[in-house]
Amino acid sequence: MSYNSNPYNGGQYPPYNTYTRPNYSPNNGSQSNNTVHQYQPPRMPPPSTRPQTDGNSNQIPMENVGHISLSSANSHAYAPPSGPPPNTGANSYGNPNYSGPQLPNTQTQSYNLAGGGNFQYQYSTCQGKRKALLIGINYLNTQNELQGCINDVMSMSQLLIQRYGYKQEDMVIMTDTASNQRAIPTRQNMLDAMRWLVSDAQPNDALFFHYSGHGGQTKDLDGDEVDGYDETIYPLDHQYAGQIIDDEMHEIMVKPLPAGCRLTALFDSCHSGGALDLPFTYSTKGVLKEPNMLKESGMDVLHAGLSYASGDIMGAINNVKNIFTSATNGFNNNALQYSRQVKFSPADVISLSGCKDNQTSADTSVNGFATGALSYAFREVVTQNPQLSYLQLLRGIRQVLSNKYSQLPQLSCSHPLDMNLAMVL
C-alpha cells in the first residue's frame, strides 16, 4: 500500500482546495497560492519561542535555531580529490554498476567498543527494493520563507530516478505546495511518512531520506549528546505541533531496520551534523573523528564575539551557552561512549548533513536557480563523478562549498565505516 493511500488516521481527507493551512501571517499582505514561486530569502531565523516536543507530546523550550540565506552564488566546478581512487575490483553491483572504489564485504562485521561491548553490523548490497522520502519546506508567506527547498527535492527525485533506479511509485515527495493533503509536510504527516519509509524493510534494501528546510537545536534530555543539545527539524506546522528532534527520527527510521538494510539520509538544514543521531562521524581524511571540546569551545568564543559584533545577540548568547555546556560536561567523552552504545545499529545507515551541529546551512541561488547549498553540492559531485567512494564524496562536497561557504558538511554512520567503499544508493 502506498503512503498517500494509507489511511493512517482513518477517514477521508477533504480536497486540497478546501484544506486550511496553518494560520501564518503573510509578508507584506501577499497571498499564498499553489504554484512554485521565485522565493525571497528569509530575513531572520525562526523565533526562539516556538514550541518543541520531547517525543512524548510534552512541550519544551527550543533554542539555537536558524537558517542563513545568501542572495547568490557562483557555480563551482567540481575537481576530484587528489590521488587515485582505491584499487578496483571486477564485481558488478546491480543498478548502478561500479568499477571504481571497492565494494563492501556483506559478511557480518564486528566492532569492539572501548570500555566493553561487542557489536555486529552488516553492509547492504542495495540490490533489494528502493524507497525514498523527500521533504522540502519553503515556509511560504512567512517571515522565515526559504527559496530553494522545494527545488531541492524535485531535483533529487529526478536524480534518484534517472541515475539510481528508484521508481516514482516508491517515492513520497512532501512540499508546502503539494495538492495531496497527505503530502503537506505537517509534523504528523512527516512522522507517518518516516514510518512508511522503513516499513517492511529487508536486508539489502536501499532507502533514501532527504530533508531541506529549517533546522535548530534544543536541550538534550537523555544524555546522548556530547554538546548537550539535540538537533531538530521544522515541520510546516511547527508553531503549533512542535519540532521533530533527532531522537525521534532515530527511533522511527534507524532502530527498526534489520542488519544489512541501507538508509541514506541527507539533511540540508542548520545544526544538522547529528540530525539522525548516528554515533560515528568521519573527517575528510577518512578517519573517525573524536570530539575535541577544547577546540569547539574556542570556536564558540570566536563565534560569540562575531555574533555580538554583527548585532546577532541571540547567536552570541547561544555560543556562550555552548562554552558553558562544554565546561560543565567536563569535555564529556562519557556521552560519546553512551551514544555509541545506545545508537549503534546493525543496519547500514549513512547520513550526510549540511553543516556541523553548531553551524548554519546556506539557502542560496546558483545561476538563478534557488537551492540549498548541500543539495546542490551533492548533485554536482555524484553527477560529474558517478563512481565515488564515500571519502571522495565527502571531499568533493566540501570542495564545491569551500570557496563560498563556511559550513562544513558531515558524514556520519550507524557503525564504523570503511570510507574507501563505493558510494551506493
Swiss-Prot record:
This is Metacaspase-1. SUPFAM superfamilies: Caspase-like. InterPro entries: Caspase-like_dom_sf (IPR029030), Metacaspase (IPR050452), Pept_C14_caspase (IPR011600). Belongs to the peptidase C14B family. Residues 13-28 have a biased composition (Low complexity). One of its GO terms (biological process) is proteolysis. The keyword Nucleotide-binding does not apply. It comes from Schizosaccharomyces pombe (strain 972 / ATCC 24843). Residues 29-38, 88-110 have a biased composition (Polar residues). One of its GO terms (cellular component) is cytoplasm. Transmembrane segments: none annotated. Involved in cell death (apoptosis). The active site is at residues 214, 270. Induction: Induced by stress-inducing agents such as H(2)O(2), sodium nitroprusside and cadmium chloride. It is found in: Cytoplasm; Nucleus. Pfam families: Peptidase_C14. Residues 1-110 are annotated as: Disordered. The keyword Acyltransferase does not apply. Its EC number is 3.4.22.-. Gene3D superfamilies: 3.40.50.12660. GO terms for molecular function: cysteine-type endopeptidase activity. Keywords: Apoptosis, Cytoplasm, Hydrolase, Nucleus, Protease, Thiol protease, Zymogen.
